[in-house]
Amino acid sequence: VLSPADKTNVKAAWGKVGAHAGDYGAEALERMFLSFPTTKTYFPHFDLSHGSAQVKGHGKKVADALTNAVAHVDDMPNALSALSDLHAHKLRVDPVNFKLLSHCLLVTLAAHLPAEFTPAVHASLDKFLASVSTVLTSKYR
């Protein structure tokens, strides 16, 4: 459960991401594909090379979903319901992959926002991404 301080930290950190959200989303995906090659199996139709338009496009989708989750941090289950349905029923993404992408997002944010990425912000973002992952996997049951 996100505390009021966590919510404040997440909103402030995501506010710093701003216009770079899509780029950071794409970078996190690239990190995931390189670090965890099995995740590529969900994207057989993508050009997964560095700078690929398809990876950039999906990175923007990831970032937009996270922006939506930040905006609706108190009601993520409703805000992410359609996305949860998509990943559980149509795409059938293994839930472990959300943890892998979350890790890569944290690394990407730490690399780009070193001054803002304090231990408290790191912990808050980690809890937030875990909450998003929980919501996205809630319809697997």
From Swiss-Prot:
Q: Which GO terms describe its molecular function?
A: heme binding; iron ion binding; oxygen binding; oxygen carrier activity
The UniProt keywords, alphabetically, are: Acetylation, Heme, Iron, Metal-binding, Oxygen transport, Phosphoprotein, Transport
Modified residues annotated as N6-acetyllysine in this record: K16
GO cellular component, as recorded: haptoglobin-hemoglobin complex; hemoglobin complex
- Positions carrying Phosphotyrosine are Y24
InterPro entries recorded for this chain?
Globin, Globin-like_sf, Globin/Proto, Hemoglobin_a-typ, Hemoglobin_oxygen_transport, Hemoglobin_pi
Query: Where are the Phosphothreonine modifications?
Result: T8, T108, T134, T137
What does the entry state regarding organ or tissue expression? Red blood cells.
| Transmembrane segments annotated in the record for this chain | none
Q: Where is the Globin domain?
A: 1-141
Modified residue annotations for Phosphoserine: S3, S35, S49, S102, S124, S131, S138
| Binding site residues for heme b | H87
- Provide an example Pfam family for this protein: Globin
Query: What top-level branch of life does the organism fall under?
Result: Eukaryota
Identify residues that carry N6-succinyllysine: K7, K11, K16, K40
Q: Subunit comment for this entry?
A: Heterotetramer of two alpha chains and two beta chains.
Q: What does this protein do?
A: Involved in oxygen transport from the lung to the various peripheral tissues.
- Family named by the database record: Belongs to the globin family.
User: Which named protein is this?
Assistant: Hemoglobin subunit alpha
Q: What is the lineage of its organism?
A: Eukaryota, Metazoa, Chordata, Craniata, Vertebrata
